[in-house]
Amino acid sequence: MTESHIDFRRAKFLISAPDIAHLDQYLPGDVGVEIAFAGRSNAGKSSALNALTEQKNLARTSKTPGRTQLINVFELDAQRRLVDLPGYGFAQVPLAMKMKWQQSLAEYLQKRACLSGVVVLMDIRHPLKDLDMQMIEWAVASEIPVLALLTKSDKLAQSAKMKTVNEVRKALAEFGDWVQVESFSALKGTGKPKVLSILNEWCHPQWLANELENQDNAE
């Protein structure tokens, strides 16, 4: 099947849900393709989503990290969605709330059959914290490909940036082809073409081709 190019600028807000159970209630079944964005509360997740879709206010940025508790879903087309998962790991969030978020994130990664890939965003100056590794391990254990995206790359000189990227690639080499590592700057746009290329590939898994073919045959 020839892959069509997905225009991520067409992303539009679909729904918000407090947890995975409610997500199942709101969405039309566990079908099509979802790409999830996860990261620590200060990883620049909202800024990255806005930069990738070229929409300033698609994902709301907050001056208070950890405030976004909802799972926010954005629609690309009838079959494809981007899912903005709650930020994790912020110190000022109560422990009970942290545990609830982590349980919800784990549940989503393990149970969502239409999940085609996970972008784990990390500040390039502070990569691979414990919860980042946990997210990556959960995804790979569920056989979901991961893009470890090192954000805010404009904060480092080119040599320091490449050094960090190589160190993270080495640290994640045990996961083989399941994990890719790239750097990205929402401010400068550096790394954007590569990220969009990976997302576009994830938008065309074989199971979606089979689903669409079955629909055509049924008609």
Swiss-Prot record:
It comes from Shewanella oneidensis (strain ATCC 700550 / JCM 31522 / CIP 106686 / LMG 19005 / NCIMB 14063 / MR-1). The keyword Cell division applies. Its cofactor is Mg(2+). Necessary for normal cell division and for the maintenance of normal septation. CDD domains: YihA_EngB (cd01876). Disulfide bonds: none annotated. One of its GO terms (molecular function) is metal ion binding. Mg(2+) binds at S46, T68. Keywords: Cell cycle, Cell division, GTP-binding, Magnesium, Metal-binding, Nucleotide-binding, Septation. Gene3D superfamilies: P-loop containing nucleotide triphosphate hydrolases (3.40.50.300). GO terms for biological process: division septum assembly. The gene is engB. HAMAP family: GTPase_EngB (MF_00321). One of its GO terms (cellular component) is cytosol. It comes from the Bacteria. Belongs to the TRAFAC class TrmE-Era-EngA-EngB-Septin-like GTPase superfamily. EngB GTPase family. This is Probable GTP-binding protein EngB. The keyword Nucleotide-binding applies. Residues 31-205 form the EngB-type G domain. GTP binds at residues 39-46, 66-70, 84-87, 151-154, 184-186.
